[in-house]
Amino acid sequence: MLYEINRRVDWVLVGGRWTRVSVIGTDLFNETLDEIRDNIGNRVVILMIPGNPGNDGFYADFGQKILKCLLLRDERVGNRKRHYLFYTVSHLNHVVLPNELKNSGKHRHYDLFKLDDQVQHKLDFVREQLPMAQKVYILGHSIGAYMMLR
């Protein structure tokens, strides 16, 4: 069976600061994403914390390949009821803010953030934005692995 794996990129407030987030999955309509925040079901969430330069787009191909492998494995073993979501959260100010967001939120596009600020930002993302799931896997690349361990 063929699955269409899509990627959606949004700007969301995390700890009052605008953050670019991408989510990859097979069903990314607004209604579905709102529904899945409240209903755990057979959801598996994979959170990717990037290394530098901290851009979510760098992991788009990686996330799609992971989901494709998981879906093919589920099909092979006869388990087609899991709903996988692959989230990647950018680091603060590592992605250019859109013009319409530059003067809103708690930070400005020229603010600098220390490593501890970035770690707190990822914790805030998990608490505020990441949907609940049966299983959550956290992956980190380079400095993202360090943040994950903190």
Where are these regions (language model features)?
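Alpha-helical interaction elements in eukaryotic regulators
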Residues: N55-F62, L115-Q118, K122, G144
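Gly/Ala-rich beta-loop-alpha elbow adjacent to hydrolase catalytic centers
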Residues: L139-G144, M148
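Conserved acidic catalytic loop of the alpha/beta-hydrolase fold
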Residues: D117-V136
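Short, surface-exposed "cap/lid" segments of acyl-processing enzymes
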Residues: G15-N103
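An N-terminal hydrophobic leader/cap segment in hydrolases
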Residues: M1-L13, S22
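Structural motif
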Residues: V44-V45, K135-Y137
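Catalytic nucleophile-loop/oxyanion-hole region of alpha/beta-hydrolase
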Residues: N103-D116
